Design a protein with these regions (language model features):
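Active-site signature of alpha/beta-hydrolase-fold catalytic machinery across serine-
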Residues: 62, 143-147
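Alpha/beta-hydrolase fold nucleophile elbow
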Residues: 123-133
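C-terminal catalytic histidine-bearing segment of alpha/beta-hydrolase fold enzymes
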Residues: 195-201, 205-253
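Gly/Ala-rich beta-loop-alpha elbow adjacent to hydrolase catalytic centers
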Residues: 133-137, 141
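A conserved short beta-strand
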Residues: 151-163
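Short beta-strand/loop motif that positions the catalytic acidic residue
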Residues: 182-185, 189
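Conserved alpha/beta-hydrolase "nucleophile elbow" surrounding the catalytic nucleophile
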Residues: 51-53, 132-134, 186
Length: 253
């Protein structure tokens, strides 16, 4: 398999493809960038970025500009190849309205395995893992959080995302008290209606999560004001554990 063009200005990014020795342990193609201070004896926070419909492991690197230097960045590729190019986390049954439960469950199992394997092969602290998902990647993040009783996250960011309409997600979860959740959505989103974001916000608030919510006058993308808010949110959840005073480590790279 041919290696894609890695993101420019992202520093020492490593591509883990099918021939890489770490691939059998993770089962998802991914890119990773470790901070210089990362050691097995000194595991670091990590931010895992889940791309949207038709993206790949290089699609989410624009978010490096809001991620603190202290954190590793990991970008997995969704396991399903799309007919028109790129990759997807799950298929749809009716246009883009009803998720296909079988393909979603298959990807969910692989994502769970992937996340559980990361601290075994990289110097990452599993208790300081944050997820950022865009669109379908956010839908996968919500599905993971709502169905994984044992999952511990530093936080979850949902960008132009939604909770999939699946029976498995209908029952309320009771393990989300205090979970930091960031939601940003465009009021003119033509793909995922704004109401889906508001429903997501309301549900997590009922479940006890600490929700940071914002709407911006934009379409199916991330507004610059949302990026600034995301930067602050990430700093708060990842840097408070080191005192929050080390600007060199807590600023983005």
């Amino acid at each position: 398999m041919r290696q894609p063009n890695l993101p420019k200005n992202a520093g020492p990014v490593e591509w883990v493809g099918p021939d890489h020795p770490f691939y059998p342990q993770t089962e998802l193609i991914h890119c990773i960038r470790l901070p210089q201070a990362a050691r097995l004896s000194h595991p670091t926070p990590a931010v895992v970025l889940l791309h949207g419909w038709g993206g790949d492991e290089c699609a989410m690197w624009l978010f490096q500009q809001v991620i603190p230097k202290i954190a590793a960045i990991n970008t997995p590729r969704a396991p399903l190849e799309h007919d028109t190019g790129g990759f997807i986390w799950f298929k749809y049954r009716i246009a883009r309205h009803q998720p296909d439960g079988d393909s979603l469950k298959e990807s969910l199992a692989r994502l769970r395995y992937f996340l559980s394997a990361l601290p075994d092969i990289y110097p990452l602290d599993p208790a300081r893992l944050a997820l950022i998902g865009f669109s379908q990647g956010a839908a996968m993040s919500h599905t993971l959080v709502l169905t994984s009783m044992q999952l511990e996250l530093a936080g979850l960011a949902s960008l132009a995302g939604f909770i999939p309409d699946l029976p498995e997600l209908a029952e309320p979860a009771n393990h989300l008290t205090g979970l930091p959740l960031f939601i940003a959505h465009g009021s003119r989103d033509e793909i995922v209606p704004l109401e889906r974001a508001r429903q997501t916000r309301d549900r997590y608030q009922r479940l006890g999560a600490e929700v940071t919510y914002s709407e911006h006058s934009t379409g199916h993308k991330i507004h610059t004001e949302a990026m600034r808010a995301l930067k602050k949110w990430l700093r708060d959840i990842l840097c408070n554990q080191i005192g929050g005073n080390n600007d060199e480590l807590c600023n983005p790279s």
